[in-house]
């Protein structure tokens, strides 16, 4: 059976420990594009944190439900309000999963947003946003110690967040 959840695989030259530390430092990589604000704990089992972006366009609350140091982290989305969607709570009940493994002398990060599937309204915009945060900001944090700070909000093709062409 084919996995239809949104998934991104990244390979880096850093150790699993450095990768895990970067992932837990959510404020440093899930930011820089839409006036994001993150409050709460992002490192320990049962920590809860909120993510707000786009001046009220996106709100979600995540709970860390599984942590295997240097190998895996799972967030359960317990609340969501994505104001650019008809079904604003589309993320509620979904899981955001980071799996870390050694691949020779490199480290692989397998990111899966379980429940973010092509049939839901958010799929295109949310998968584009995840790709941007992961492939630019998280990778930059892992490789250079600093999350990416975008200069243009409309860098996410097709995004409905403020400043994008679909919203204007």
Please annotate each region the language model reported:
Residues 19-23, 49, 64, 75, ...:
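Hydrophobic pocket/interface hotspot
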Residues 3-9, 48, 59, 72, ...:
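Intrinsic-disorder/low-complexity, polar/charged segments enriched in Ser/Thr/Lys/Arg/Asp/Glu/Gln
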Residues 2-16, 65, 90, 101-107, ...:
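Aromatic-glycine hotspot motif
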Residues 11-15, 52, 78, 101-103, ...:
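Solvent-exposed residues in well-ordered beta-strands and their adjoining turns
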Residues 115-168:
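A conserved amphipathic terminal alpha-helix motif
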Residues 7-8, 18, 25-61:
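Short beta-edge strand/loop motif at the mouth of beta-sheet-based domains
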